[in-house]
């Protein structure tokens, strides 16, 4: 029986599974922003604008996140996907 299973085509994940995964990502993102200070969205936008002055990047290539730990520390994480140089 396992030999027949090997040759069967694998099913693509259903749209319900894909939608559930996307919803989980959105909920996790919103939970992460729940403890962020009020000025965080404006600060995030200003950081992205400064990066765009020097490097041509799209809004989806810059990620800014604020993580707060139990030890009363805040970590500002900034990830930028830089374009390849020609």
From Swiss-Prot:
Pfam families annotated for this entry?
A: MinE (PF03776)
Presence of keyword Cell division: yes
User: InterPro entries given for it?
Assistant: MinE (IPR005527), MinE_sf (IPR036707)
Origin: domain of life: Bacteria
Keyword annotations of the record: Cell cycle, Cell division
Tell me if Cell division is a UniProt keyword of this record.
Answer: yes
BP GO annotations: cell division; regulation of division septum assembly
Gene3D superfamilies attached here?
Cell division topological specificity factor MinE
Report the family membership: Belongs to the MinE family.
Q: State what this protein does.
A: Prevents the cell division inhibition by proteins MinC and MinD at internal division sites while permitting inhibition at polar sites. This ensures cell division at the proper site by restricting the formation of a division septum at the midpoint of the long axis of the cell.
Protein's name in the database:
Cell division topological specificity factor
State the organism named in the record: Shewanella halifaxensis (strain HAW-EB4)
| Organismal lineage | Bacteria, Pseudomonadati, Pseudomonadota, Gammaproteobacteria, Alteromonadales
Q: Which gene encodes it?
A: minE
């Amino acid at each position: 029986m396992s030999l027949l299973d090997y040759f069967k085509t694998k099913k693509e994940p259903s749209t319900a599974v894909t939608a559930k995964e996307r919803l989980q990502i959105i909920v996790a993102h919103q939970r992460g922003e729940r403890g962020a200070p009020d000025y965080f969205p404006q600060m995030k936008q200003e950081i992205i604008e400064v990066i765009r002055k020097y490097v041509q990047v799209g809004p989806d290539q810059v990620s800014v996140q604020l993580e707060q730990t139990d030890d009363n520390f805040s970590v500002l994480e900034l990830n930028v996907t830089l374009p390849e140089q020609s």
